[in-house]
Amino acid sequence: METKNIAILLDTDNTQLEYLPYIIEEVKQYGNPIIKWAFGNWTNSQFSSWNVPLSNLTFRLIQSPTHVKAKNTTDISLVISAMDLLYTQPHITGFCIVSSDSDFMQLVMKLIENNKFVMGIGRKQT
């Protein structure tokens, strides 16, 4: 069986920082996490404590600025990036969407239609 090359796409608006090491270990059971991107508004002081732990875990920080309150710019940025990876990086054979937001179902279906392995990690109620 061929090792999967997995892209971890992290929705920081709906994830807890302390679980990230466990999430990465879980992903490693299924393949090699070669892309680790964390999406969020990094100018927001709420995420200031995330920079060092994410850097230590080799995540690339993707800025998703919020221009209007209560809009899902982080979700949209994550979906656009996933689609870009899907169509431009054929060596990516799997995706791990880390979020406790159920809005990603259409993305998951599109990835599966394109024969990609997909993991979803989030809270049980998601």
PLM features per residue range, with description:
Residues 1-87, 107-113, 117-119, 124-125:
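Domain-level signal for Mg2+-assisted phosphodiester chemistry and nucleotide/NA-binding surfaces
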Residues 97:
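Non-catalytic, usually N-terminal nucleic-acid engagement modules in DNA/RNA processing proteins
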Residues 101:
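Active-site-proximal cofactor/substrate-binding loop regions of enzyme domains
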Residues 104:
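Catalytic nucleophile loop
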